[in-house]
Amino acid sequence: MDQTTTYYTLGIDIGSTTVKVALLDQDLHIIFSDYERHYANIQETLAGLLKKALNQTGPIDIIPVITGSGGLTLSSHLHVPFVQEVVAVASALQDYAPQTDVAIELGGEDAKIIYFTGGIDQRMNGICAGGTGSFIDQMASLLQTDAAGLNTYAKDYKAIYPIAARCGVFAKSDIQPLINDGATREDLARQ
């Protein structure tokens, strides 16, 4: 690597439902970040995000790194370093939010938790996508809103209903009859 060239770090996260990019300057300040759903068009979505970044920054020299559940294959095809997702999140939090005790990361189809106190301990759900981003999207769609709308509705809840907590399919099966019985969006969003 040329010592006189200014390099920027490009982080690429290829998830099960979205592509995320972050461009950092040499002082590790974020100068561009964005994400989009890829709808199974990962390469096109990534190309679009990179074009947006280039339009904002102009031509620059980058050092890319890839993470995410869908990133390993792309990493090997492009000969770009791959960092396991939980390692990338833990590393970023230690740099940007060193006071963090516990971090929860909801992916499209998985959920991860990282404990920092007393050493780093990482855990991941392994049973079902219940409680993940895809599940939240499904519930938002069922209630004819988006994820932010669920938060808005939940602020005004009046009742809590028993909903399956371990499986997204069972939770959806619990929610549909509640909708049919007239449960409010506010109450269902709180679940």
Predicted regions and their residues:
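Short glycine-rich, Thr/Ser-proximal phosphate-binding strand/loop in the N-terminal lobe
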Residues: 6-44, 48, 121, 126
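Short glycine-aspartate micro-motif
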Residues: 7-13, 63-65, 99-105
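A short acidic Gly-Thr/Ser loop motif
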Residues: 13-17, 68-69, 106-110, 132
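Short beta-strand scaffold segments in enzyme catalytic cores
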Residues: 19-24, 110-116
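Short beta-strand-loop/turn "lid" adjacent to the catalytic site in phosphate-handling enzymes
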Residues: 28, 35-38, 53-87, 114-123
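Short, well-ordered amphipathic alpha-helical segments that serve as non-catalytic structural scaffolds
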Residues: 42-56, 93
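Glycine-rich phosphate-binding loop plus the immediately following alpha-helix
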Residues: 118-159
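Adenine-nucleotide phosphate-binding core of ATP-dependent small-molecule kinases
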Residues: 171-191
